[in-house]
């Protein structure tokens, strides 16, 4: 379980970090190499989920969606200095519960 959580976090950081660099390049006139590095990081994001032990592509990517929401709230708070409000935190907790149910609910 620890391995899965680490991979979810790494993938989320790669997705958000890569996307953020592309955003800075295109929206805030940063140098072209921001976009190149961001694109390479996004390719890495595409590879990381393949390291998961869960057999279902759909389930893994759905779970990444929930983790992404949580990490995006934290990224916005830490990097963009946008303090999350109560609704942001409530939404993040709901996503975390959903991810937990999807991945670790007992199945036959």
From Swiss-Prot:
Keywords tagged on the record: Cell membrane, Membrane, Transmembrane, Transmembrane helix
Compartments, record wording = Cell membrane
Q: Where is the signal peptide?
A: none
Entry-linked InterPro entries: UPF0060 (IPR003844)
Q: How does it sit in the membrane?
A: Multi-pass membrane protein
Q: Pfam families in the record, alphabetically?
A: UPF0060 (PF02694)
One cellular component term from this protein's GO annotations in UniProt? plasma membrane
Membrane-crossing residue ranges in chain numbering: 5-25, 31-51, 60-80, 86-106
Family membership, please give it: Belongs to the UPF0060 family.
Q: Which PANTHER family match?
A: UPF0060 MEMBRANE PROTEIN YNFA
Matching NCBIfam families = PRK02237.1
Q: From the Swiss-Prot or TrEMBL record, give the protein name.
A: UPF0060 membrane protein DSY4629
């Amino acid at each position: 379980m620890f391995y899965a959580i680490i991979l979810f976090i790494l993938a989320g950081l790669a997705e958000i970090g890569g996307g953020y660099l592309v955003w800075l390049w295109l929206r805030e006139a940063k140098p072209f190499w921001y976009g190149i590095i961001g694109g390479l990081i996004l390719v890495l994001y595409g590879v990381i989920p393949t390291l998961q032990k869960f057999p279902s592509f759909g389930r893994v990517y759905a779970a990444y969606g929930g983790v992404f929401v949580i990490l995006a709230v934290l990224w916005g708070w830490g990097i963009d200095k946008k303090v999350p409000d109560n609704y942001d935190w409530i939404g993040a907790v709901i996503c975390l519960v959903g991810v937990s149910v999807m991945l670790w609910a007992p199945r036959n």
